[in-house]
């Protein structure tokens, strides 16, 4: 049996050091039919009589995304299937919720849905042509952004978990959340705004996904030419500054010994955070390997359960 922490976020599904975009669409991958190569982070998945591409298509970011449609379940089972070479997989999993939904009835509803999966026979899913039989034997829901539960630091600490769809801001004291909120500010929206700005200023057309891949760059390639986009750094600075204002509204910042920042956009925005909080502010930490922080926390949570 395997134990697996899965961070099924608005942007990416992360697990065991692997990831794919939290997107799905009905279709087939040409690479599996011998037409070119299969993209590493896209997977052809057959489930419940339909064939999907997981890792491409449309994101599912609505507040009820855990309960409507097949998308959440599809990404969850795909992550489990990819995590093991075995055909028949028994597993225990830990998944996350943003801090505000976690503190609400959403947690109980998600736990109920996941526990319903544990009562079913093994789910059959075919990933990139390989059949998998998956039985979820236990499912735990944990809070996103709870890095202190990994380090077990008892100091007064603020954690800022930067997601593609939301930002979790939590102040901890003695491992207890004393102030928290889920801020509806989206890196996905920022990527779209930067792409639109480049288009509207006559420099060419790029996708938000391309901006994400080159986030923070001062030059990017458009139509075979290097194009200066250094002015977009001001957009990033304003975004970070606005989030810092949210942090001050939510938390007692002067009391915090550390401010720990992680998530998909953390490393690329490290300097912006230090500038926004002020160069004199000590204790600001941008965590390495930030995109996988939550999945690593969930992994430790499920491994500790007896």
Q: Language-model features: where?
A:
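Nucleotide/phosphate-binding catalytic cleft detector across ATP-hydrolyzing
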Residues: 1-159, 176-189, 209-306
């Amino acid at each position: 049996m395997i134990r697996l922490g899965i961070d099924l976020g608005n942007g990416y599904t992360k697990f065991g050091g692997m990831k794919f975009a939290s997107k799905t669409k009905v279709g087939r991958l040409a690479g599996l039919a011998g037409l070119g190569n299969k993209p590493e982070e896209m997977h052809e998945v057959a489930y419940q009589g339909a064939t999907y591409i997981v890792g491409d298509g449309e994101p599912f970011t609505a507040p009820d995304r855990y309960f409507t449609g097949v998308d959440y379940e599809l990404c969850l089972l795909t992550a489990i299937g990819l995590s093991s070479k075995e055909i028949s997989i028994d597993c225990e999993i830990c998944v996350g919720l943003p801090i505000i939904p976690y503190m609400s009835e959403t947690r109980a509803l998600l736990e109920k849905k996941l526990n319903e999966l544990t009562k079913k026979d093994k789910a059959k899913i075919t990933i990139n042509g390989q059949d998998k039989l998956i039985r979820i034997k236990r499912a735990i829901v944990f809070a996103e952004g709870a890095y202190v539960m990994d380090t077990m630091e008892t100091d007064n600490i603020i954690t800022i978990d930067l997601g593609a769809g939301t930002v979790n801001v939590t102040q901890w004291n003695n491992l207890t959340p004393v102030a928290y909120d889920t801020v509806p500010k989206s890196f996905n929206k920022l990527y779209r705004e930067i792409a639109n700005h480049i288009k509207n200023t006559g420099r060419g057309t790029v996708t938000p996904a391309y901006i994400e891949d080159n986030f923070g760059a001062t030059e990017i390639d458009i139509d075979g030419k290097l194009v200066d986009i250094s002015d977009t750094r001001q957009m990033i600075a304003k975004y970070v500054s606005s989030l810092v204002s949210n942090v001050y509204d939510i938390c007692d910042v002067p009391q915090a010994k550390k401010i720990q920042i992680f998530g998909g956009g953390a490393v690329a925005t490290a300097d912006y955070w230090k500038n926004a909080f002020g160069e004199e502010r000590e204790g600001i930490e941008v965590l390495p390997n930030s995109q996988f922080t939550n999945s690593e926390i969930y992994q430790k949570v499920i491994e500790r359960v007896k």
